[in-house]
Curated annotation (Swiss-Prot):
Keyword Zinc: yes
SMART domains named among the record's database cross-references: TOPRIM
GO annotation (BP), single: DNA repair
Keyword DNA repair among record annotations: yes
Domain of life the protein comes from: Bacteria
Protein name as catalogued: Recombination protein RecR
Chain ranges of zinc fingers (C4-type): 57-72
Function noted in UniProt: May play a role in DNA repair. It seems to be involved in an RecBC-independent recombinational process of DNA repair. It may act with RecF and RecO.
Start and end residues of each Toprim domain: 81-176
Any one GO molecular function term: DNA binding
A Pfam match: Toprim_4
Keywords: DNA damage, DNA recombination, DNA repair, Metal-binding, Zinc, Zinc-finger
Length: 202
């Protein structure tokens, strides 16, 4: 069966999503055309609107539809003096959902990866350095992912913090709540042991 040009284009477009291969893209395309054309139209309209309307906060670089996001506009957060550095806007959402962090963010939109041609400027570290050079930030929380690239990025930023005499801390890594030791990888166990805390009595 020879697929039409429009259907082929739709399948190819769906493949741009991470984790979606040729078969999955074909399955989604056929489902939308067979059973959910209204949903497909809504998806197309939402994608078009989002691609046009959603940009980046000029201060923290997360997604927003204004020049600055609500977090950066918060006077209370501005006065906290704390800046949390993350790799992605999805990390901001995850941290915000805990309701425990009340500082500002800086979103890298990636991590250092020289082999892929991603250096400091590609992830906005020149912009971050400008922020550190200005007064107002007392602590930077390094919340990059616990990968080789994430650790390298955190180390680079920690050096920038030291240069401008700004405190830097790394989020703890260890055993997840409800996890079992025999199912945890060696690197995670190593972090858990090195980040252990004393047990005190109340």
């Amino acid at each position: 069966m020879q697929l039409s040009a429009s259907l082929t284009q739709l399948i190819e477009a769906l493949r741009c999503q991470p984790g979606i291969g040729p078969k999955s893209a074909q399955r989604i395309a056929f489902h939308l055309l067979e059973r959910d054309r209204k949903g497909g139209t809504q998806l197309g309209n939402a994608l078009t609107k989002a691609m046009t309307a959603v940009g980046h906060c000029e201060s923290c670089r997360t997604f927003c539809e204004q020049s600055q996001c609500d977090i950066c506009l918060s006077t209370k957060r501005q006065d906290s003096g704390i800046l949390c550095v993350v790799e992605s806007p999805s990390d901001v959402l995850a941290i915000e959902q805990t309701g425990q962090y009340l500082g500002l963010y800086f979103v890298l939109m990636g991590h250092l990866s020289p082999i892929d041609g991603i250096g400091p400027k590609e992830i906005g570290l020149d912009v971050l350095e400008t922020k550190l050079a200005q007064s107002g930030i007392s602590e930077v929380i390094l919340a990059t992912n616990p990968t080789v690239e994430g650790e390298t990025t955190a180390h680079y930023i920690a050096q920038l913090c030291h240069k401008y005499k700004v405190g830097a801390s790394r989020i703890a890594h260890g055993i997840p709540v409800g996890g079992e030791l025999d199912l945890v990888d060696g690197t995670t166990l190593m972090h858990a042991f090195s980040g252990r805390r004393a047990v005190t009595q109340d």
